Amino acid sequence: MLFRSGGLLQGIGMTLYEDVWYNEKGVNLSNSLMQYKIPTRLDFDKIRVEFESSYEPTGPFGAKSIGEIVINTPAPAIAQAVYNATGVWVNELPITPEKILKGMHVI
């Protein structure tokens, strides 16, 4: 499962978890996995991944790259889902409950 959905999980992590914090002197405060959150296998159940057959005439033997593409797709999909559910556009990552509540003028 992981080898088929790893890029997708990375994209979800980038969208919902990953954030870099710096102090006023520019020192990275999130330089370990204690502060820099990423998802683990325990955060997700099974994800169904399907491949569509196609032919790319410029690729080797008709192949296409898929590794990097899947990282970019969760962010707009999740942002759209948040907007559909709440009416709030979150336009910077990560998308957090705090940002959604601020957009709803709750906090």
Residue ranges and their predicted role:
Residues F3-I107:
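C-terminal catalytic domains of large/alpha subunits in multi-subunit enzymes
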